[in-house]
Amino acid sequence: MLLKIFALLCVPVSILIFASMNAALWVLPLVYALCLVVTLLLAAAFLFFICALVDNTKPQPEDNKFYRAAMYLYIELILQVLGVTIDTKGLEHIPTGRRFMVVCNHQSETDPAFIHHYFRKSQLAFLSKKEAAKLPVFGPMMHMTSCQMVNRQNDREAMRAIIKCIQMIKEDKVSVCAFPEGGIIETDKLSHFRSGVFKIAQKANVPIVVCTLKNTSSVLHKLKRLQHIHVRLHLVGIIPEWEHAEMTTVEIADKVYNMMLEDLGEEYRPAVAQNT
């Protein structure tokens, strides 16, 4: 939709430019193409500008509505420009009118973008590795949209991030999304889960929305080769709070793992997988 708006806005501008040039008619498509490219470059420049204004060291007490809206718009624009095809299933079951926790397998740095795109009405905040805060554009956007960074080398800091997620859900500020594998896996195999992350859903007393992503590991590779990008996002199921309240976090991890594996297929099963 956003790309179509840009394309339509470029029509009168390119016609005006063409009229002032007094050039041959075949020049008009070139003027239009150049106008569209310049518009997209200006949009990219604006994104980098607003991200440059963010101080990642300064605590962000509230979710920033401007940066969240900008993030959604740019994700939509980028997916349209790249011509990404996304097959979805089960997303009609996304809870409405309440907070929840989303968990998904993790294949690529682009995973949050696909999840954000379809959960934009849910106001998600991601639990992410600390290193992500240093990434240009991604880091500032995550900081301004209540994402919590986890230091995987420091259990105390990791627990603080989990407690903060619980607090934000209880205060009805955001819903939370986490990747229980704990990081991007180099192969497509579903790695073992870090069960501690499920404390968020238990302590906040919210349902767990189980999702799976396929083919995102090849997104950046295909982008470099200008190949078509085809991604799949499924909502596999929902574990209500009354069900997981009586389970240990390891039992929850095992249940979620099996739900994901059943949807992804046996080719995603590793040789050895033990949730901890």
Question: What residues fall within each predicted segment?
Answer:
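Membrane-anchoring hydrophobic helices of lipid-metabolizing enzymes
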Residues: 2-14, 23-99
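Short acidic-hydrophobic, aromatic-tinged amphipathic segments that line or gate anion-handling sites
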Residues: 88, 148-151, 241
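Generic preference for hydrophobic
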Residues: 88, 102, 126, 233-235
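Non-catalytic C-terminal accessory region of glycerolipid acyltransferases
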Residues: 159-276
